[in-house]
Amino acid sequence: MSARDTPPNCASLRTLAARRRPINLEGMDDLVRRVREVLPSVRRDLEDLVRIESVWADPARRPEVHRSADAVAKLLSDAGFGDIQIVSEGGAPAVIGRHPAPPGAPTVLLYAHHDVQPEGDHTQWHSPPFEPTERDGRLYGRGTADDKAGIATHLAAFRAHGGKPPVGVTVFVEGEEESGSPSLSKLLAAQRETLAADVIVIADSDNWSTDVPSLTVSLRGLADCVVEVATLDHGLHSGLWGGVVPDALSALVRLLASLHDDDGNVAVAGLHEATAADVDYPPERLRRETGLLDGVSEIGSGSVPQRLWAKPAITVIGIDTTPIDKSSNTLIPRARAKISMRVAPGGDAAEHLAALTRHLETHAPWGARVTVTPGDLGQPYRIDATGPVYDAARAAFREAWGTEPVDAGVGGSIPFIAEFAEAFPSAKILVTGVEDPATQAHSVNESLHLGVLERAATAEALLLAKLGSDGKIAT
């Protein structure tokens, strides 16, 4: 193992039994109480962060992202973190705060991000997107859950320990996750020594419900592209030439339809399929959570978890053609679409994009010319969630939530997890979060369930205690 691969205290996790006392259960009760005590101030801090329109994808609001980074740095300083840095490698500002590990104790890296998605159509929000508003036990606003609540979770857990947890804690708050983390790999390389840890907690996922926590054990990857179809060198009168000469939009529609079979399964050859966790996901839950209209059926074959977490998915997310209000009786010469593909755990995003490209190039109807422009790639990730660190996490969930956590997959992508795994191959990675099925992250009326915030913060505080005190913890 090279020096770059060695966590700061990997031996400490292996020999903790000889160095640290067993958990004091009475102390754990005190810790739960202290989380409740700090939550009101943490919520105020969260609301202040939500009021900052930290949308890195909007160049006009990039100064707000810098203001958000300054606010996060101050919160970390006020909580008792030292060695606070605002860092950048040509992209958005990220914030790092460190609390050194006691002798023999492991170091835990806590990740979140302070940038948010654009808010979309203001008229579709029930309250202003950047003015946090509570309704029915939920806090509404852009970033309340994704992922400024991740920052709040870390702050609450750290403050509950009085700023002196029994482990080293490094908080890393990224500023461009919603834009695909384009400079993260450079940040990890530049800050490798600063960010090195034995355990990495990524608080950017969701939970099974508001009453049942999840430990995310797999995520699909992402590959996208733009396909352009051309049939003519100029538009033609549809009355004079329609029925003889193909138009590009009709060719594009037929090409896109070839991506799925009649049951909605992906019909592209050469794609990988994994095996999903054995979790009960009844159809009525799916309909309730997605807003599927009456009479509209599901697509694909296999269980819901298998289709959501372990099979590839292809979605057409945009089409460029003549808008209806500017349409005329013309055969359209060119049309294009953007295609997003989810890659099952164990697959390779680049290979899947190549397979999709081959399909598009070989299935064009009527000899239409097809040009495929590759886009973003993000690798899938599967976590081997076994061993003492994961046992400690499940115990912390169980104590904080009062029920067993669900090992769940996520159909979406967090590509940077693979980057963390590559940068710190010996670290154990835990993917947690504060979202729930009603959160509506990335959509209008995003919200945070305040009870989930309390339980997530409590679980993280308990986890820090267990990692620092339980003689059973070992890598």
Where are the predicted features?
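An extended, acidic, His-containing surface patch that forms the Zn2+-binding/catalytic region
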Residues: 78, 209-210, 265-326, 330-334, ...
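Histidine/acidic-residue-rich, glycine-tolerant segments that coordinate divalent metal ions
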Residues: 165-246
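N-terminal helical capping/dimerization or prosegment-like subdomains
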Residues: 27-122, 334, 338
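Active-site metal-coordination/substrate-binding segment of hydrolases
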Residues: 105-173, 455
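Short, Lys/Arg-enriched N-terminal segments with co-localized hydrophobic residues
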Residues: 18-27
